[in-house]
Amino acid sequence: MLRQIIDSFDSAILAFLTHGALHTATYGHAVSHVADFYLFKGVLPLAMLCAIWFDTRERRQWQWQRQMVVATVLSGVLALFIGRVLAHYLPFRQRPLYDSSLHLTFPIAATPEAVLRTWSSFPSDHAMLWSAVAMGIFLVSRWMGVIALLQCAFLICLPRVYLGLHYPSDVLAGIILGAGVTCVVTRKPIMERFAPVIVRFIDRYPNVSYAGLFVILFELATTFDEPRELAQSIFRHVLHG
């Protein structure tokens, strides 16, 4: 019964997007670029985290804000990892782009076809990652958090549904799971176990710390695409010789 409700919901949303006035070649081309550009995915929310980190207007809350930034970054990494583990071990769900039973036509996505065909659609790891980051921002700054959540919804999640990369339920589940990860990691008893130590280390060794943080934020913004591709290349070379 639940599966039928979800399928009906997904089909209705996809039909609306693909048969509506927005389904044009020009709009599809623009959305494809928005979905593929890292600027619209990770750079904006991570820039907000940097702004929070260096915001010294409230000195009494400064250390807490920096601890929250650390916890948010960790939440994002953890959410991305959990999302890809779930996609690997849960029953495979074909992406709507390749489901001929839907009888829908989607714009061509920029992501390589081989990657799309072999990765399960559920849950959306992009939705998990960036909803986790957006929730962390929201817990520190309401107005910045609202912007981050809207950016996650309209510049990350909605384009991926429009392009047929995910079903609406994929991104909704990803948003809920990602935000949930942040809510757990940022709980005071949990955050106090690791965040203050990391902040003190950064304060004590700023040069090496900020260099390392730059690399971490870069990889997070690009969803660790290059390390993943390198690992897959090495694995294929070792496996096939």
Residue ranges and their predicted role:
Residues 63-139, 143-151, 228-235:
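Membrane-interface loops
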Residues 89-98, 155-181, 229-236:
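Interfacial helix-loop-helix junctions of multi-pass membrane proteins
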Residues 1-46, 83-113, 225-241:
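N-terminal transmembrane-helix/juxtamembrane module of multi-pass inner/ER membrane proteins
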Residues 76-81, 153-164, 218-223:
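Aromatic-anchored segments of alpha-helical transmembrane domains
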Residues 43-52, 127-143, 176-188:
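Membrane-interfacial alpha-helical segments at the cytosolic side of multi-pass membrane proteins
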Residues 34, 126, 170:
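Divalent metal-coordination and catalytic microenvironments
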Residues 76-88, 175, 179-186, 222:
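Transmembrane alpha-helical segments of multi-pass membrane transport proteins and ion-pumping complexes
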Residues 2, 65, 69, 73, ...:
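Multi-pass membrane proteins that catalyze or facilitate reactions on polyprenyl-/lipid-phosphate substrates
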